[in-house]
Every structure is written in structure tokens, then in C-alpha cells.
Amino acid sequence: VFTENAKLAKLVYQASQEAKQQVSVFSLADEAIAKVNSAGENIDMDVVEQRTKALRIDDIYSIVYTSGTTGRPKGAVLTHRNAAGLPHNGVDWIPQVLRGEDVRLLLFLPLAHVYARFLQLLAIGGDGVVGHCANVKTLLPDLQSFHPTYLLCVPRVLEKVYNAADAKAGSGTKLKIFRWAAKVAITYSRALDEAGPSTSLKLAHRAADRLVYSTLRSMLGGNVRYVISGGGPLGERLGHFYRGVGMSVLEGYGLTETIGPATVNTAVQSKIGTVGPPVTGNSVRVTVDGDIEIKGIGVFAGYLNNDEANAEAFTADGWLRTGDIGSLDEDGYLRITGRRKELIITAGGKNVAPAILEDRLRGHPLVSQVVVVGDNQPFISALITLDADMLPQWLKNHGLEEMSVEQAAKNPEVLAALDRAVERTNEAVSRAESIRSFRVLTDDFTEANGLLTPSLKVKRAAALAKYADVVDSIYASKASSMPTD
């Protein structure tokens, strides 16, 4: 077993002792690779060749544990068929991204995330060079020195890049220019899907490129043409913004149980707002109730030592129940609504998909994370955390003095800005689905405190358990004045 540091190595060793299993534990902080290489110096190459030839395509490639956003993590058994077949098909699916002498990928998602591991396999099957960012704190200089041509990221990263650029513009003329350029990018991208941009729009786009887009591309290394996004939905507005800037975001959809994207938009035909059609070798169907099911080369063999979970995971005819709900359009492109388990049913019987509200609200520069709540309650509300990195610049841009997150959580101007953001968010849904109240938390959600997964998804069950008293206070204070929808 390989661990990141000595502390984890000690924990694994203690667990193996308690289980009475003989396990060799290596810490990467203690020359683990050198020790393994040394141990293998005297092994006959014939033995290595025999072991290699003994492998079969349906043998276990890796056991990857699910993120546990809604429950206890489970060990997903992935096979060599998954690890070889889907990346092989993926290279032919998006050759414009993966083929060419100058192709370069910089990975900054942790390899604990199955999507990052898949992209590494995909890149090896394609052309070019793969680089790894050792620390996200050095991501910007790493991007500028490595000059990647494509990236893998989660939507939250794209949201933060946009918000940082908006905040950096400051106020006054510079801010007006940035927001004008953003509007031009979005309009230009939408026009590409319709009759094409007009002459005046093309001229405005060229001007915006000189003033804004070229600088933004330079921040990311100057050569990024494509961004593969997964792990959650990206708002259509941001998708159009990035394409208008010159970096097409190819949204995909997959699970740990599918080793990588079961569906993904292509470089040739992308529908912003969808997660694309099934990758070759995979099939997707949607039941009459909207449940998404997958079958094909990427689907895992089952959960390790968990017959009960396996029975729940697969249909009688062998399709994987994803637990997500959505729809397929006439061209076979998949659109995600949300997780079935995360659907909120209000006291009035209204079904509410929290992801739609959370994704829109998280686009505000002050907001770090959002959890929408309201199950069995008379109305929908939200828990909001502030982005500590963005807060100082936002305060400066709005002529406010420096303050801590704790102070900002009670500040009238900050609360008023969040209230306006909630109002804009509510424009996307009906009144019964709208957020009527919110609370600002003083602690953010992180991996360290157990409220975020490595792909920056909120562990909803853990967050609701930790802040149950805050949720209770929302409904206690509003119960007498808020009608049930």
C-alpha cells in the first residue's frame, strides 16, 4: 500500500495489524519509489513477463472508492477492460483535443479523483505531453510555464477563474470594459449555434479579444483551446463565455462506476448546456421517471464485497442505475437535472432539484459553496459560505473597508448583495422552487473538515448534519409568516 505521508502509512499499518493481514506499506514522503525499485532489482524479467501475460482483460485494474456525497463510500471494482477500452474509444471521440505534436495537458485535479486518472490514460493513448501540478497554489505560474493546450477541471474552477477576472477588473472603466467583453463573448458564442455572428458582432469580438480575451488566455498559459469539464454542471452562460473567449468547454458526464465520461460533447458538435452524447462503446437510456441508466465498456464490475449495493446498482437487464435524473434530446444529447437522492420534496409536495439553484448562486463572486434545503418544509432555503479569497477584492471594488469572513457574514452590504444574487437565481425557477431565506455560515466547506470531496462536491449529508441547528433556526423564525406552496 502506498500512502502520501508517514501519518497515513502508520494508520494503514495499524489497520492491517488489526485485520491480521500482511501488508507492505510505503510512504511517498519516505523514498517509497526508490525502495520498491530496490526490492525489484533482482527479479528475473521472465517472471515479470509471465505475470504480464497472465493478466486478463476482465481482471481488476483498480478499486476506487466513491466520494460519499450522499452516504458511505463504496469500493468500485474497475477492470482492465474499463481502463483500456474507454480511453481507446475516447481518443477517437475527440481527436481534435488529443491528437497533434503540440498537445499538452496539465493535470491539477488529484489522482484520487477517477476523472483525473482517466484523463491521464486518455492522454497516454493520444499524443503529446502530460504534466502534473504539485500544488494548486502554484497553478497559475505552472500554467504559464507549461503552456497546456487542454485542461481537465470541475465547474467550480471555471467559475472562480471568471470571478477572479471580473474582480481584477476593479471598478469604473476597466470593469465596464470587462463586462462588455463578457457580454460580447456570450452573444458571439450563441450566434455560432444559430445563423452565425453578424459583421458588427465580429468586429466587436475582435476588439474584445485585443482588450480582454487575449489577457485571460495568457493567464492560463496562452495555448488552451479546450477544457474538459466534469464532476458537476456548468451554467450555460459560462459555457458560452469561455467558447466566446476562444476556449471551448466540453462538458461530460460520468461516475466513479463508469471510470470516466459515459457521455461527452465533441469538439466538432458541442451543445452547451448538455453533457453530450454517449462515447463510443457506451449506451445511455432515460426511464419514464427520468432516471439515467448506462451500459457499456466503461461500466464497472460491481462493488467490492457488497452484494446488497450491487443488487441496487443494476437493473434486471444489466444497466447501471446512476442515481441521476435527466433527459435525452432528439439528437441523443444528455441533459442532467440532478441526483435522485438529493431531490427536495417540500411540505406542499413540490419536487425541487437543488443543483439548479446551487449552481446559479455559486456563480456570484462572494459565494464559495451553497447547500439548498427544504425537505418536508414549507419553503426552500439555503446555507451559503463566503469565498475568503474573493472577499477582499469585492470589498475594495465596492468601497468597503477590509473585514473578516465572520464580520462579512453579518455586514448589511454583503447581505444585500447576496439577497440580490438570490433574486437573480430565483428567476430560473418557479415561485414554489425559489429560495425564500438563507443563512451565511462563517466556516467554508473543505476537504479537511470533511464537507467537500476531492472534486469539490459538497458532501450534502455531512453538511446538513453539521448545520442542522442553523437549518432548524431558519424554519423556526419563518414558520409563522411563510405560507406553504
Listing of model-derived features with the role each one plays in the protein:
Residues 369-372, 378, 419-485:
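Conserved C-terminal "lid"/linker of ANL adenylate-forming enzymes
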